[in-house]
């Protein structure tokens, strides 16, 4: 090295000494301390004990669930056994507490009874129909609102097929009924814009056979509203309280199916003038009238429910029923005059095969006081006389004989209805 001019020693002396140091990794190869191992083991044992306890609890809950299912099935069978026997229909009056109540039976007696634990307490409302056990009178079931009620609503296929065109004459009566019943149901906004309340009820009165019920049938045919028809005598029941309950059922059914029309025929059966009743039957009829007045006063104008009443004894009705606010419009159906007779004869005979010699004007001009039902009876009787002789044409002699037959039956005027 010296030969080539490189001095090694000097270079080595000049290079500083390098020191190599190991990096600090922080890893310990000696393992955890003994204290840490003891903590982990104790925690493991504790979790293992908790798992065993939860497994025991799971088994206990499964066994308890099986027992509860058995009890539930047994309770269901017991309820079915109780409900399988004939039950008594009653009326829920008042709840004493969660387990007992006061109910009324059809015999008029009230009972303090127990309530089956499976019954939904929200269904127990005053005057609700309930089923009572035959022997203990315990309340075992709640019947739907429409059960135990003789009030039925006419469906679309049960409505009468009588149209306004089938009713001869009575143009004024038709217009008044349609204004009071149909128009408020179809165009309520007209009354609201004018600022008046539509009529709540309509009373149709007049002698028998003048078309009151027939016009009500035409209203039922033409309207799309629900139509409920009852007769006044239906409210008079054997047991106390049944009549007022039926009145409530009628108006409840109408409100639930609004818009609706309630037609009460022969209203004089329950709405005669009140007096100092001496018998229980008279007092019950008066209670029915009071319930009817209460229901009509409770009408909400926003509920589209209209009431039509018909009678041939308007003079016997109670003044409280006739006052404005209950029956706002009173429509009279008098015996037909000459013009009305002509229209009724023309309407009824339009479908009949009459001979050319039949002069209807002759029968119209006769002074006999006859109703529309009498005219219909004359036409029907003349047709029956033609059938008796195997003819397809009704002759004038058939009409004459039929007229004498019908009028002879009604020779005496109806002084009762004047």
UniProtKB/Swiss-Prot annotation:
Phosphothreonine-modified residues are where?
A: 25
Q: Which residues carry this modification: N6-acetyllysine?
A: 397, 401
GO MF term (any one): ATP binding
Q: Please, one GO biological process term?
A: proteasome-mediated ubiquitin-dependent protein catabolic process
GO CC list: cytosolic proteasome complex; inclusion body; nucleus; proteasome accessory complex; proteasome complex; proteasome regulatory particle, base subcomplex
Residue positions, PTM N-acetylmethionine: 1
Its subcellular locations are: Cytoplasm; Nucleus
Q: Does the keyword Ribonucleoprotein apply?
A: no
UniProt-listed InterPro entries = 26S_Proteasome_ATPase (IPR050221), AAA+_ATPase (IPR003593), AAA_lid_3 (IPR041569), ATPase_AAA_core (IPR003959), ATPase_AAA_CS (IPR003960), NA-bd_OB-fold (IPR012340), P-loop_NTPase (IPR027417), Prot_ATP_ID_OB_2nd (IPR032501)
| Keyword line | Acetylation, ATP-binding, Cytoplasm, Nucleotide-binding, Nucleus, Phosphoprotein, Proteasome
Q: Where does ATP bind?
A: 206-213
Keyword Zinc, does the record have it?
A: no
User: A single Pfam family, by name?
Assistant: AAA
**Residue numbers bearing the Phosphoserine modification:** 21, 28
Q: What is its main location?
A: cytoplasm
Provide the family line: Belongs to the AAA ATPase family.
On assembly, the entry states:
Component of the 19S proteasome regulatory particle complex. The 26S proteasome consists of a 20S core particle (CP) and two 19S regulatory subunits (RP). The regulatory particle is made of a lid composed of 9 subunits, a base containing 6 ATPases including PSMC4 and few additional components. Interacts with NR1I3. Interacts with PAAF1. Interacts with TRIM5. Interacts with ZFAND1.
What the protein does comes down to: Component of the 26S proteasome, a multiprotein complex involved in the ATP-dependent degradation of ubiquitinated proteins. This complex plays a key role in the maintenance of protein homeostasis by removing misfolded or damaged proteins, which could impair cellular functions, and by removing proteins whose functions are no longer required. Therefore, the proteasome participates in numerous cellular processes, including cell cycle progression, apoptosis, or DNA damage repair.
What is this protein identified as? Answer: 26S proteasome regulatory subunit 6B
User: What is the source species?
Assistant: Rattus norvegicus (Rat)
Classification of source organism: Eukaryota, Metazoa, Chordata, Craniata, Vertebrata
